[in-house]
């Protein structure tokens, strides 16, 4: 009886919290300082923690970075900003897309906003409440931002509304990671330099300027201006081998079964066994953020230091893996990505980017920080 209870305890302990995203905050700090080493000492840093810090947990990431030399945090909308405030983040929070209906919340939680069109500028001019703002101009991304031709009108409106305190002016690079588009990137930089020079002439003073993201820092650091925005590089991805991924997604085998030649695995009979096989079932699926295109020998995992391929179609909450050629037991650890399974490699197979694979990880996956 005692032996049975001990075995049960060990098994249940292995099976508890089956799927976990392990996050190494020390690597986060090392990535931060590595990227900072490419900058002038006076260059300020905005940490991008939008989309739940690219799936890593925005409050925990922001609190760690808040201990460092950070100008502020960049989020997508007011809900992300409020979440950080309620989570105890004290520093500057910049909302990239504040929307037209969030004014009272922006004021209540002391959030900065990015103003990128006349509708937003007119709204915050009309409200007459003190607000910290950052202007965004379009230089080729053709997404958010005032056009260069609007510059003089924007400055006139700002000068008529001193309650709007402009802290910086920015734009966004469209393709800073690719050398083949270097001319386009340099043209964006040139346009922005002209915009900022004209802006400073019109206001009769200096303003903080920022254009570079992670890949911009890696490839165009001489154009760093006054401030940079670091996103994916903090989490360990980027065209630089010195950046180390900060996360590792692991689960466990929850069931092992043997199947015969001719048996199928998963929905749609998409995988037919050509021989007798042993398969493991892992409780992670596309609802957790595991891309369904990794089905049927596209995706692979590590079990007991052995490479194993996903077979059958990935389900909403599970996938199956071929363990015929390894020694494995129910409860054994499964590495889905991490030091042994590269997110970059996984993204390339899927014709996507690490950003997507990280940010689509469901929040129901437990995050463990060390």
Predicted feature descriptions by range:
Residues 19-22, 27-30, 43-211:
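Active-site-proximal beta-alpha core segment in soluble small-molecule metabolic enzymes
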Residues 6, 11, 16-25, 29, ...:
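Active-site anion/phosphate-binding pocket segments in diverse small-molecule metabolic enzymes
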């Amino acid at each position: 009886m005692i032996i049975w209870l001990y075995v049960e305890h060990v098994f249940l302990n292995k099976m508890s919290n089956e799927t976990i995203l392990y996050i190494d905050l020390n690597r986060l700090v090392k990535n931060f300082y590595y990227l900072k080493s490419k900058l002038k000492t006076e260059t300020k840093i905005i940490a991008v923690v939008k989309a739940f810090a690219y799936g890593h947990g925005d409050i925990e990431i922001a609190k760690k970075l808040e201990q460092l030399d950070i100008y502020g945090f960049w989020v997508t909308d007011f809900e992300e900003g409020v979440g950080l405030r309620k989570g105890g983040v004290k520093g500057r929070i910049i909302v990239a897309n504040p929307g037209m209906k969030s004014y009272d919340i922006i004021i209540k939680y002391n959030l900065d906003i990015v103003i990128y069109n006349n509708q937003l500028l007119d709204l915050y001019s009309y409200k007459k409440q003190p607000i910290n703002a950052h202007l965004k101009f379009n230089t080729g991304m053709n997404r958010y931002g005032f056009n260069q031709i609007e510059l003089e009108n924007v400055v006139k409106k700002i000068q008529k509304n001193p309650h709007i305190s402009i802290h910086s002016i920015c734009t966004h690079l469209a393709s800073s990671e690719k050398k083949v588009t270097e001319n386009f990137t340099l043209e964006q930089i040139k346009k922005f330099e002209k915009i900022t020079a004209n802006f400073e002439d019109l206001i009769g003073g200096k303003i903080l300027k920022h254009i570079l993201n992670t890949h911009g820092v890696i490839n165009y650091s001489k154009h760093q201006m006054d401030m940079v925005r670091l996103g994916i590089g903090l989490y360990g991805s980027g065209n630089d081998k010195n950046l180390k991924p900060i996360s590792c997604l692991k689960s466990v085998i929850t069931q092992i079964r043997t199947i015969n030649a001719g048996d199928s695995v998963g929905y749609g009979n998409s995988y037919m066994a050509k021989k007798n096989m042993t398969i493991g079932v892992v409780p992670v699926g596309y609802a957790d953020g595991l891309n369904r295109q990794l089905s049927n020998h596209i995706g692979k995992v590590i079990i007991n230091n052995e490479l194993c391929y996903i077979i059958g179609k990935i389900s909403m909450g599970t996938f199956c893996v071929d363990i015929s050629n390894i020694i494995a037991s129910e409860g054994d650890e499964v590495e889905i990505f991490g030091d042994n399974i590269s997110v970059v490699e996984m993204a390339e197979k899927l014709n996507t980017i690490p950003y997507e694979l990280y940010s689509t990880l469901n929040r129901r996956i437990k995050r463990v920080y060390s």
